[in-house]
Amino acid sequence: MVKLAIDMMGGDDAPGIVLEAVEKAVNDFKDLEIILFGDSSQCTLEHDRVEVRHCTESITMDDEPVRAIKRKKDSSMARMAEAVKSGEADGCVSAGNTGALMSAGLFIVGRIKGVERPALVVTLPTVSGKGFVFMDVGANADAKAEHLLQYAQLGNIYAQKIRGIAEPSVCLLNIGTEAAKGNSLTKKAYRLMEDQHDFNFTGNVEAKGLMNDVADVVVTDGYTGNMILKNLEGVAKAMGKMFKSTLLSSFKNKMAALILRKDLNGLMTKMDYAEYGGSVLLGLNGTVVKAHGSSSAKAFYSAIRQAKIAGEQEIVKTMKETVGTENE
């Protein structure tokens, strides 16, 4: 049985989409228990495997992250993180303030001993629909080469345990594929990754090749990763608008869109971030999943499923044994 703590109040459309996603999750997974943290008066869900714990505070998107976590002790997010820290819950999911959730992860759940910098990881779509693990996308703007090496180790475990890839290929994001390319950070990181035997390092990858299935895991610093992620989101939205405008521009195009509707829906599903769940803060003493702030019920459900798999696969235990220093 896996038990997850859920922030009922986080996100643009909470608690509605959260309750819808939780209801579907407990109905689909008979080995899942949920603790919902939030305003109990707004909870309309009743289920024998769902417990509701009333919180008098909530953290908004406008709150200063660290201050909010430290001052709002009875917020749904802080209480949720405490449940993970105490071991009562195997993991947690929130669509709330990203910075606050990262602060809750660091200051409440805590880092795995030996992990210098936790990293924020996402799974992004590729042309084949397989997707790839990408990190760090914003947990740390600055990074040392040793941090990138740890990111690669964490990402390798994530790809194995969560995505079911037996021997993931791991690449370093760079301005060229040659080993000598890049700045001092990427050159040193390349040497460190090349010298290790913990994962299958296959070299550098350029940004233009990210979505072409060249690697299962791609590693970079949080500053670069966050810009890449936001650029991909922006391009995807712009292309969607252009595509829609073209399809609706004439009767001929509208007829073509009608004929191709099933194929177009399949393409959109392949590229839909909701299929892959949320972003995960790796390197902590518990699973912390961040669903998108504007998540639909479908996207939040995927994030719950993601956290459940992490609990089943004991991903935190594996990271402690592989990357951590607790057993040394």
From Swiss-Prot:
Biological processes, Gene Ontology terms: fatty acid biosynthetic process; phospholipid biosynthetic process
Gene Ontology CC: one annotated term: cytoplasm
Keyword Membrane included in the entry's annotation: no
UniProtKB keywords: Cytoplasm, Lipid biosynthesis, Lipid metabolism, Phospholipid biosynthesis, Phospholipid metabolism, Transferase
Protein name, per record: Phosphate acyltransferase
Record function comment: Catalyzes the reversible formation of acyl-phosphate (acyl-PO(4)) from acyl-[acyl-carrier-protein] (acyl-ACP). This enzyme utilizes acyl-ACP as fatty acyl donor, but not acyl-CoA.
Record-listed E.C. numbers: 2.3.1.274
Source organism per UniProt: Staphylococcus saprophyticus subsp. saprophyticus (strain ATCC 15305 / DSM 20229 / NCIMB 8711 / NCTC 7292 / S-41)
Pathway: Lipid metabolism; phospholipid metabolism
Family per similarity comment: Belongs to the PlsX family.
Main location: cytoplasm
This protein's record includes keyword Cytoplasm: yes
Quaternary structure and partners: Homodimer. Probably interacts with PlsY.
Top EC class for this record: transferase
Catalytic activity: a fatty acyl-[ACP] + phosphate = an acyl phosphate + holo-[ACP]
Gene3D superfamilies in the cross-refs: Isopropylmalate Dehydrogenase (3.40.718.10)
Gene name of the record: plsX
